[in-house]
Amino acid sequence: MELSMFGREDTNSSQWGEVHGPFMLEEIVCQAQNMLTSRGIFMKSNPLKYALPLLLLQMSVIIVTSRLIFRVLQPLKQGMISAQVLTGVVLGPSFLGHNVIYMNMFLPAGGKIIIQTLSNVGFVIHLFLLGLKIDGSIIRKAGSKAILIGTASYAFPFSLGNLTIMFISKTMGLPSDVISCTSSAISLSSMTSFPVTTTVLAELNILNSELGRLATHCSMVCEVCSWFVALAFNLYTRDRTMTSLYALSMIIGLLLVIYFVFRPIIVWLTQRKTKSMDKKDVVPFFPVLLLLSIASLSGEAMGVHAAFGAFWLGVSLPDGPPLGTELAAKLEMFASNLFLPCFIAISGLQTNFFEITESHEHHVVMIEIILLITYGCKFLGTAAASAYCQTQIGDALCLAFLMCCQGIIEVYTTIVWKDAQVVDTECFNLVIITILFVTGISRFLVVYLYDPSKRYKSKSKRTILNTRQHNLQLRLLLGLYNVENVPSMVNLLEATYPTRFNPISFFTLHLVELKGRAHALLTPHHQMNKLDPNTAQSTHIVNAFQRFEQKYQGALMAQHFTAAAPYSSINNDICTLALDKKATLIVIPFHKQYAIDGTVGQVNGPIRTINLNVLDAAPCSVAIFIDRGETEGRRSVLMTNTWQNVAMLFIGGKDDAEALALCMRMAEKPDLNVTMIHFRHKSALQDEDYSDMSEYNLISDFKSYAANKGKIHYVEEIVRDGVETTQVISSLGDAYDMVLVGRDHDLESSVLYGLTDWSECPELGVIGDMLTSPDFHFSVLVVHQQQGDDLLAMDDSYKLPNVEHQKIGDTGIQQRFSAEEGFTTIDLGKR
């Protein structure tokens, strides 16, 4: 057949047209040779008639359009997947594709084949990464609650949806092909994919919330249910022939080879590289790509999609660092950000709204009604099972909406079914549209209904001031990102002067950014996987604090945790642990790290966001620690110089009172010099009317301390405005090792006049922001008192007995830890 029969220009890189196939009309594409790159417009050569320029144009238009649509949909909390599908819809036959000239220029048949091939390669790699981030053991950690909800989330829609088909087919009569397509669509609508759910949770910043952890486990259970049903259906409908049995055994053999051959090879190569001296590349990148290609090719040879082998190869490998982290960093950039948008957009390009309207309206309406009924049954089944498990009604509704969210796995399955003619074009269009509609509404409602910060609002007062007034145990939660944070945190603990009569409980939380795994982690240190590189750093942190504990035996009680979550939501773990352990004060590092010469060495924007989120939602008081200790190398706790001089800058307000309460505890340490600098305006010298009597009592107590102890000093600075206040603070120089200050002050105070107009770091307050200047070389602790009603109930669970009459050397004194200490592990698997 000559190309001229197709009615196209012979200068195109490809020619196409319809020919008679064995069963129906099919489209054939003839690709011209030597039409890869254009000679240029100056040589009168149209670049769009050549393969490479056309491919680059297609990718550019798809990526730019998807980003624009995503930006438009952002206020509605829609995901990138929805934006990419809508990109295909806009660029496809539903809208712009009605223009024949545009379609022949932008998406000719030959150009479509090339971009489909490349995008499928990107999708195979992306699915491998999704599998790599899955921890197979998570299904074993799912408690009975997650198993019940996950099973109900699949069983209700699958069974009731098929019953609806049976009822409608008997009462109204539906053709057999419509029944077959709709049954397949029901099985797809009933499933909830674990990778999709974790992606949605991460995008909504609730992956490590209580609801997020429950949804993670439920989605895994639901997906396993869909696997079993699909396997049973496949075995039931498959022809009972030796060929079918041979094909099934080959697929099982591929899975066994992946797990028992490919996996050990990759793990062995990774361990070998990790132990080598070359730390630049700890992952066998090219061997992994080779085995990935073999697994994908084997899947295609056995009659399944190439992504099947890639996905299960990823599942078989250990998630998290080093393998998962390194591979994700190298592959996600071009696979997930470049080729994947093209793959999803092509699914939208295959969607044609006009084919739906032009087809039989009765069948279209029936299919859509059945699909909506299926999603409704999924929602009701999940909500009912959640309510049965005594989940709060708001959380049950949000969980039901989350289980209705679908994404790339479902879109991919629909495309495969369309190519295999399991569903027709009409059903394919309806499924894609319904997924967009249901997922879009569900995501928006979850954002509107669920606020994880409400869970962290404590019903009792947990402040340092309250601890001091009612003789309660001081309980600290220390957030750390690396071992460099340890020495100054140890200095802070030592400055608070733990004794057997006034002990301290503290909890360390190693904060790790989630990379290379899909689900968040909050676990005690002793339960961490020893093969995880984060365990090694956590062990260094724990060992340092354990040395410190040995120094204060009987006066300290500690527990050590590690949290791995996206930085955008890791504040949920901080607040969860603080609430669970009834912490009095959360101490978190400042987002700027200072070099040894005092200048700013590194600025970490995500850590600043964490600090702001913790300040807004914390169930207790919060302190941001500006560390100006030695930052050269990994400091040893044994070599750290303890603080000798501490100052407190007092202006007025609740936060200053909170900082003063902590300062007064430090003043009890015999070998620590403590100075309180009280800023007062000249007009207030004769006015002793304080906004809070507790503030007045604190100052009076400190003055009494200063009168009786030589190492405690009270200094009153008389200033007229903010300029003189700044001059006094600037004169501190290097006289102190650490300075305490409240975050918020009495803004009506004249001593701040002129200072409140500008602030670079509002999370530190006016004075705290001033102390971040490189002119100062001491560490700073900015304290913010617990927010909420002053009438909060007092929690005396950790009340200390009155031992003022006891002597320090009395060995008969019992340890002053509450019998209800509750130093137990957090079982996150049974949510």
Swiss-Prot record:
Membrane topology: Multi-pass membrane protein
Induction: Transiently induced by K(+) depletion.
Thylakoid keyword on record: no
This protein's UniProt keywords: Cell membrane, Ion transport, Membrane, Potassium, Potassium transport, Symport, Transmembrane, Transmembrane helix, Transport
Tissue expression per record: Preferentially expressed in pollen before and after germination. Detected in pollen grains within anthers of the flower buds or in pollen on fully open flowers and on the stigma, and in pollen tubes growing in the style. Weakly expressed in roots.
Gene3D superfamilies: 1.20.1530.20
Disulphide-bonded residues: none
Similarity comment text for this entry: Belongs to the monovalent cation:proton antiporter 2 (CPA2) transporter (TC 2.A.37) family. CHX (TC 2.A.37.4) subfamily.
Miscellaneous note of the record: K(+) uptake enhanced by a proton electrochemical gradient (acidic outside). Not affected by specific inhibitors of voltage-gated K(+) channels.
Name this polypeptide is given: Cation/H(+) symporter 13
